[in-house]
């Protein structure tokens, strides 16, 4: 059934998420601070500056790197980070709280912390460092999307779920074919098929057969009939 298929997909996604997270943790712990610093994944050592509430009412703290300031880094707004402290014996203690970059430039960062307890822990550390943490944003979005589809009931989302994942037939509207002299006959038929679809239409074919041209024309024609069209792609190439 559609629900069991989606629940199975949830399970597989959870397994992938746990594996990726564990693999990130393993690589992080075995790489060593020096290599992470050279790759721009880590600042160590760092100093702490003032703490305050930003315009989003988030508790934030200023962080400044003390060494290796010429190395480019990958810290940027919205990325998750975690703090750690290196003991005099060389062992690293990672703090439990996950923080978020609020602002970053070449030598300074402003980091949003989850609470006053985390702030005190960061301020109290002697040999403090900060590094990128496993980014759960995309996984969180995927889990939420699957949950929305599973829970859908009596609405358009539920209809599309059952059409795409079960034997419920899709619907088509009767329209007069539109002529497109600048397209070949196959492309013209595909555009008309899209315009007739009430639920879903799939345009497919080998490379170089003009799928992108067909989709562009279908979007253009749809905008004559609808207010807006959402276009999604795995990359920006198309």
Predicted features along the sequence, with ranges:
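Domain-wide signal for the mature, well-folded portions of proteins, strongly enriched
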Residues: 20-22, 35, 161-164, 176, ...
């Amino acid at each position: 059934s559609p629900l069991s298929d989606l629940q199975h997909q949830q399970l597989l996604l959870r397994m992938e998420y746990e594996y990726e997270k564990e693999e990130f943790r393993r690589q992080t712990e075995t790489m060593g601070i020096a290599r992470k610093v050279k790759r721009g994944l880590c600042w160590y050592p760092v100093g702490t500056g003032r703490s305050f509430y930003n315009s989003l009412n988030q508790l934030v703290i200023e962080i400044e790197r003390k060494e290796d300031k010429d190395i480019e880094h990958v810290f940027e707004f919205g990325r998750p980070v975690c703090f750690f402290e290196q003991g005099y014996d060389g062992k690293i203690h990672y703090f439990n709280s996950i923080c978020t970059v609020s602002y970053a430039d070449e030598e300074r960062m402003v980091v949003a912390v989850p609470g006053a307890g985390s702030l005190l822990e960061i301020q109290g550390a002697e040999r403090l460092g900060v590094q990128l943490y496993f980014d759960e944003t995309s996984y969180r979005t995927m889990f939420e999307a699957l949950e929305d589809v599973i829970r859908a009931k009596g609405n358009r989302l539920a209809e599309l779920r059952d059409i795409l994942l079960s034997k419920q037939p899709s619907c088509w509207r009767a329209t007069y074919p539109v002529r497109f002299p600048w397209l070949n006959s196959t492309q013209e038929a595909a555009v008309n098929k899209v315009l007739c679809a009430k639920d879903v239409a799939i345009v497919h074919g080998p490379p170089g057969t003009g799928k992108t041209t067909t989709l562009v024309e279908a979007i253009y024609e749809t905008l004559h009939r609808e207010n807006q069209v959402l276009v999604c792609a795995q990359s920006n190439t198309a």
